[in-house]
């Protein structure tokens, strides 16, 4: 078994076993606390440019199947596990995790203390990291790593380049792709929506020309401040048609209305995050994947906080006080994770129907 090392920008080194693609990579190291759902996580474009650590000790035991892709071409930089299952056992299995990562040109490392690694990230925050082969001078690797500037065009990398339809017989929805998870599209299709997926750079005029009943702002990777043109688009459609934002879409919707965002120390990544609906006290367990959040202190008067994370009290949902528009930081589409919050898609459908009847 070939050895591979993980080097953090603070100089910490972990030595383990190589699997997946035989290449060196650099990215932001993060951790995911989910016990299952590794295929959905690896193929989630919100992990673009990141080295993904799984805290659950065994990963790969049910293999990779054709149904659980969140995107066809995953763009995470690398995968870190305590133990990689060399054999997969599941009736849907088509290939092992190792075979999948090789095919997608993603390196992995196993056999390291992922609990110790996670504690470092929790204490010091996410940071740059390198997956490389044994043999190079550690001082040289660390110097190179500390000099590395990570890309800021994450959304541009993963957004669709051209518009495409997902036909349905129901309400017409324009889905703006900032790094779209297929599960969002599936939830809209289950509700018979006639969906047009458009690039992140689509203007308000182009969206309104499609005459939709509503606009959905998808999830996506990176810093919401990197796509200022999206704020103009949101302001241009807001009030004219209903809006529903998820994850990155939530942050952009809030920013377009005057809110500010900040980078979290280590983010929320997993599907055991308890979120409280403030008006009712209802608690949902949610799937989350984000490193930025909306600032509670800078929220303008016309945005109402509707949901908050129980543990750190971060803003998990907002609604416009006067217009048909709302957003949530978490993933009501789950994939992976609980479906507690899938009712939000129904609320969006109802919002579009009411708006359509009144206009």
From Swiss-Prot:
Record bears the keyword Lipid metabolism: no
One example GO MF annotation: ATP binding
A Pfam family per the record: CPSase_sm_chain
Catalytic activity as recorded in UniProt: hydrogencarbonate + L-glutamine + 2 ATP + H2O = carbamoyl phosphate + L-glutamate + 2 ADP + phosphate + 2 H(+)
Domain Glutamine amidotransferase type-1: 172-358
Binding site for L-glutamine: 46, 220, 222, 248, 251, 289, 291-292
Location of region: CPSase: 1-169
Annotated keywords: Amino-acid biosynthesis, Arginine biosynthesis, ATP-binding, Glutamine amidotransferase, Ligase, Nucleotide-binding, Pyrimidine biosynthesis
Location of the active site: 247 (nucleophile), 331, 333
One GO-annotated biological process of the protein: glutamine metabolic process
Annotated metabolic or biological route of this protein: Amino-acid biosynthesis; L-arginine biosynthesis; carbamoyl phosphate from bicarbonate: step 1/1; Pyrimidine metabolism; UMP biosynthesis via de novo pathway; (S)-dihydroorotate from bicarbonate: step 1/3
GO cellular component: carbamoyl-phosphate synthase complex; cytoplasm
EC class name: ligase
Gene3D superfamilies xref list: 3.40.50.880, Carbamoyl-phosphate synthase small subunit, N-terminal domain
Function comment: Small subunit of the glutamine-dependent carbamoyl phosphate synthetase (CPSase). CPSase catalyzes the formation of carbamoyl phosphate from the ammonia moiety of glutamine, carbonate, and phosphate donated by ATP, constituting the first step of 2 biosynthetic pathways, one leading to arginine and/or urea and the other to pyrimidine nucleotides. The small subunit (glutamine amidotransferase) binds and cleaves glutamine to supply the large subunit with the substrate ammonia.
Subunit text: Composed of two chains; the small (or glutamine) chain promotes the hydrolysis of glutamine to ammonia, which is used by the large (or ammonia) chain to synthesize carbamoyl phosphate. Tetramer of heterodimers (alpha,beta)4.
Homology family: Belongs to the CarA family.
Entries under HAMAP family matching the protein: CPSase_S_chain (MF_01209)
Protein name per the record: Carbamoyl phosphate synthase small chain
